[in-house]
Swiss-Prot record:
GO terms for biological process: lipoprotein localization to outer membrane; protein localization to outer membrane. InterPro entries: AAA+_ATPase, ABC_transporter-like_ATP-bd, ABC_transporter-like_CS, ABC_transpr_LolD-like, LolD_lipo_ATP-bd, MacB-like_ATP-bd, P-loop_NTPase. It comes from Xylella fastidiosa (strain 9a5c). The lineage of its organism: Bacteria, Pseudomonadati, Pseudomonadota, Gammaproteobacteria, Lysobacterales. This is Lipoprotein-releasing system ATP-binding protein LolD. The gene is lolD. Belongs to the ABC transporter superfamily. Lipoprotein translocase (TC 3.A.1.125) family.
Length: 240
C-alpha cells in the first residue's frame, strides 16, 4: 500500500458508518448484506474497498453516499447524520460534500463536456458564470481544455471518464466515491485516469473511496479494506 502518511492534521472523518446493516427482502426470503459494519474515512485519506463479486461493495458505496438507506445503523457525512435529514437536505448535502464516479461515465449525451461539468455547480445555486469558470478550470486540469464544447459521443472512452472525474470535483467535495471508475477502460487509459484522481486528491485534499477489483491500483491507496461476510477488515501490504 502507499507509504505516504494518512493526513493526521485534518480533523475528523468526512464519512463515518456505525453498526451499519443492510438486508434485502424478496417475498419471504431475506438476504443480509451487512451486519454491524463500521467504517471511518478521514479527510484527505484514500481508501480502496475490495472483495468478491456480489459481496456488496456497490451497495456499501450507495449507503455511504446517501443513495440508499441502511436497515440498521447510521451513516454520518461531514458530521451530519443522514437518517435525520429530509430527502431535500440529504440531496443538498450530497451535492455539496460528495462526488461520484461510476464505471460508466453517466454524462448526459445532449450536453457538452463543459455543460456536464457545470451542472453540480448550478444545482448548488451558484451562477452560470461561476459554473463555467469552475468547469473550464477542472477540464483543463484533466487535459480536456481543448474539448470543452464536445459532446460525450465526440469524446474517447478515456476522455469521457476524465470528464466524469472533473464533474465529480465540481463542487470541491470533501470526498469522492468511485465504483470501479476505471473498470471499462484499457490498462493504459485506466492507469492515466487513476493517476489523475490521485493527483487531484493530493492537490485538493479530497478523500477518495474507490471500489475496485484491481489489487495493483488498490495498493496505491492509503488503506485497503476487504468486504467479507458482511464486515470490513483492513488488509496488510502482504495480503493485498
Amino acid at each position: 500500500m502507499n507509504e505516504r502518511s494518512t493526513p493526521q492534521a485534518l480533523t475528523g472523518p468526512v464519512i463515518r458508518a456505525e453498526r451499519l446493516g443492510k438486508t434485502y427482502s424478496e417475498g419471504k426470503l431475506l438476504t443480509q448484506v451487512f451486519d454491524g459494519l463500521d467504517l471511518q474515512v478521514m479527510r484527505g485519506e484514500t481508501v480502496a474497498i475490495v472483495g468478491a463479486s456480489g459481496a456488496g461493495k456497490s451497495t456499501l458505496l450507495h449507503l455511504l453516499g446517501g443513495l440508499d438507506v441502511p436497515t440498521a445503523g447510521e451513516v454520518y457525512v461531514a458530521g451530519q447524520r443522514m437518517s435525520a435529514l429530509s430527502d431535500g437536505d440529504r440531496g443538498r448535502l450530497r451535492n455539496k460534500t460528495l462526488g461520484f464516479i461510476y464505471q460508466f461515465h453517466h454524462l448526459l449525451p445532449e450536453f457538452t463536456a463543459l455543460e456536464n461539468v457545470m451542472m453540480p455547480v448550478l444545482l448548488s445555486g451558484q451562477s452560470v458564470c461561476s459554473g463555467q469558470m469552475r468547469a473550464q478550470m477542472l477540464l483543463e486540469a484533466v487535459e480536456l481544455g481543448h474539448r470543452l464544447n464536445y459532446k460525450p459521443s465526440e469524446l474517447s472512452g478515456g476522455e469521457r471518464q476524465r470528464a466524469a472525474v472533473a464533474r465529480a470535483l465540481a463542487n470541491s467535495p470533501d470526498c469522492v466515491l468511485g465504483d470501479e471508475p476505471t473498470g471499462n477502460l484499457d490498462n493504459r487509459t485506466a492507469s492515466t485516469v487513476f493517476e489523475l484522481m490521485l493527483e487531484l486528491n493530493r492537490a485538493q485534499r479530497t478523500s477518495l473511496v474507490l471500489v475496485t477489483h484491481d489489487r495493483g491500483l488498490a495498493r496505491c491507496l492509503d488503506r485497503v479494506l476487504e468486504l467479507y461476510q458482511g464486515g470490513l477488515r483492513e488488509l496488510t501490504s502482504a495480503e493485498v
